[in-house]
Structure formats: C-alpha cells, structure tokens
C-alpha cells in the first residue's frame, strides 16, 4: 500500500506531461508557404500537388514560421516548447534573407534558396520570431537543421564551409533561445562497407574511419563554438554515418564535450531491430531533445509507448518533440496522436 501511494504521489499531472513535449514544424511542412523550387530538398512541388497537402491547406490554412508559435498554442494544449525545421525559416517573399546554393545528392544537382541567418534582414526576421514566441507564450527548444553539410566530407574546404554554416545557425539558435541544434554528420548517404581484401581476408573498413575522424574533428569545433553561445550541437540517427548508433556513440565519445549530445529519433533506422536496440544505445547520450516519431514504414513493429519507456528507463529527462513522418493521418492529426501516446507513457 505504501509503495502504491508513493507511486501515485510521484505520478505526473497532465500539465506536467505536456511540459515534457515540444511541437514540431516538420509534420506540417506541407502547409508552410514556400518558394516553388525545382528539385527542392523535400519534394515541394510534388507535395503541394498531393491530395493530402491540398486537404491540409484547406483544413488548417497556410502558415509561415512566424505563425507557428500561435499554432502550437491553438493545437497542442499545454505545450510550450517547439522543434523548428531549418528549411522553413525566413520570409519566402524576401530574397534578401536567402542565399542560392547548388546541392548534390545521389548523382543529381539542384539549386535551392536557403535561409542565411547571418544576413541583416534575416536577423531582423529572427527578432520577429522571438517576439511572436513571447506573444504566444512558447519557446524555441530545438532546431532540426539541414543547412550545414559536408561535416565529414573528404574535401577539407567543403568541410570548413559546412562548419561555417553551422556556426551561423548556432548564433541564430542563441538569438531565438533554442537549447539544441541538430547537425547532420554528412558523408555518403549509404556508408562504405568493409571489404575482405586485407590481410588474411578478414573484413576491414578503412574508408569509414576517415569519415568518422572528420566528423569528430568537425563536431569538436562546433561544440566549442556552441559552448560559447550556449547552444548544444546534437547528432540524430538520420542517414549516412548516423544511421548506425555505434557510429554516433563513437563520435560523441571522441568529441567528449558537454555541448555535444544525441537527439535520438524513434524511427530513423535502417532495419526494425534498431527500433529499440538502437534507441537504447543512444539513450545515455541524450539529455535535451528526442524525436518521438511515428512512421508507418515499420508497421506493427513500432510501439510509441515502448520507445518512450526505453528513454525513461535510461534516465532521460528532456523533451519529446512530436515528429510525425507518415501514416494514416495528416500531419496535425499525426502529431496529436503522438501527443496522446507519449503522454500516456509518461
């Protein structure tokens, strides 16, 4: 009886559970106003013509990032923190806060306009975002950043350029009050595999070592800078090197910096056995942000509540960002489903 009473006394209220959550712009990216760019990073042209995207715009209207703080208050009761996707920053009608760049992926190149937070008009826009946050009573918590590239690239100049972009964004995160910022590890989307051409025919993978070494050096530099501005740099299991939780652990252990940690994602894995084993491997490295994701690619193998329990059993005390990827609901409905599941598990 005493144990039961103690358990009841320690149970979180619904308000306290909501405080452990963060809304997320990524699930509703389709209704954000954005420049139509051929070959854009998230398939904008295709998404805008899809039935789901059209239905979402009719149901929820179109948004900009400046609208999202109030959108959070309106659709996610009690949630006061936000996870913001870098590709949705800026006023798409004002080219002066964007830079044009050419991006190569899987043998294809395309041109994109990317928000440059160091530009004068961009900094003013960030001030507007801060004002909107204050008005709505919400906070930027995490920025899921796709802008810094080439972090583990074999080309030194490309790697330096990626780090420079990351530092600009760390300044921006400090300006808007975000605590953490994801940076992709870069390198090939599919990591090089071992070969048996070495001594004795035993598999050896020298190629991946170079990418890992470059990633360690880059994240050390970014973490040092993040420490100066008060923003942690995080690694998410996303693709490339970071698709393997062991690689993430290697990088974080080698960097060994209080401003460099993991942002585990419930679903960004290459096979189903990593859904929980991979998550458990990253839990000790996560302190601030985790992506509580639903993605129908895993079918019945995925259990959101079980994933939350893995994090809690590992001592995680940070925020759960509601990142719905794909499934039977639209982006807002999916995020609300995640909100219900995560709160039930807390």
Language model: regions and residue ranges:
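N-terminal pre-domain/capping segments
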Residues: 1-180, 200-201, 206-210, 257, ...
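Conserved Rossmann-like nucleotide-binding pocket used by diverse enzymes
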Residues: 22-24, 234, 321
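Acidic/histidine-rich catalytic cores of soluble enzymes
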Residues: 35, 81, 199, 203-205, ...
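Short, small-residue-enriched loops and turns at beta-alpha junctions
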Residues: 89-91, 148-151, 188-190, 239-242, ...
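A short helix->loop->beta-strand "cap" motif at the edges of active sites that frequently abuts
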Residues: 138, 231, 314-318
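Active-site-proximal loop/short-helix segments
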Residues: 184-203, 242
């Amino acid at each position: 009886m005493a144990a039961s009473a103690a358990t009841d006394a320690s149970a979180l209220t619904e308000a306290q559970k909501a405080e452990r959550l963060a809304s997320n712009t990524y699930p509703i990216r389709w209704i954000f106003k954005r420049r139509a760019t051929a070959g854009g990073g998230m398939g904008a042209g295709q998404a805008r013509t899809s039935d789901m995207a059209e239905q979402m715009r009719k149901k929820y209207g179109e948004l900009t990032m400046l609208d999202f703080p109030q959108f959070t208050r309106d659709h996610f009761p009690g949630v006061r923190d936000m996870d913001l996707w870098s590709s949705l920053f800026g006023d798409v009608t004002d080219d002066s806060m964007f830079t044009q760049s050419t991006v190569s992926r899987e043998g294809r190149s395309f041109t994109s306009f990317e928000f440059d937070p160091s530009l004068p008009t961009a900094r003013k826009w960030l001030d507007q975002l801060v004002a909107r946050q204050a008005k709505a009573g919400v906070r930027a918590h995490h920025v899921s950043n796709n802008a810094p590239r080439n972090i583990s690239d074999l080309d030194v100049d490309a790697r330096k350029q990626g780090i420079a972009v990351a530092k600009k964004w760390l300044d921006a995160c400090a300006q808007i009050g975000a605590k953490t910022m994801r940076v992709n590890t870069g390198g090939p989307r599919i990591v090089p595999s071992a070969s048996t051409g070495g001594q004795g025919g035993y598999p050896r993978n020298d190629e991946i070592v170079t990418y890992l070494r470059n990633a360690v050096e880059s994240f050390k530099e970014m973490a040092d800078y993040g420490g100066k501005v008060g923003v942690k740099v995080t690694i998410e299991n996303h693709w490339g090197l970071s698709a393997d939780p062991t690689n993430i652990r290697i990088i974080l252990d080698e960097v060994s910096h209080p401003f460099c940690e993991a942002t585990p994602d419930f679903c960004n894995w290459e096979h189903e056995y990593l859904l929980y084993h991979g998550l458990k491997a990253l839990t000790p490295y996560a302190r601030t942000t985790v992506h509580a994701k639903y993605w129908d690619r895993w079918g019945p193998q995925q259990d959101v509540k079980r994933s939350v329990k893995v994090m809690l059993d590992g001592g995680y005390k940070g925020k759960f960002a509601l990142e719905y990827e794909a499934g039977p609901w639209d982006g807002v409905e999916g995020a609300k489903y995640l909100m219900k599941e995560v709160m039930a598990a807390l």
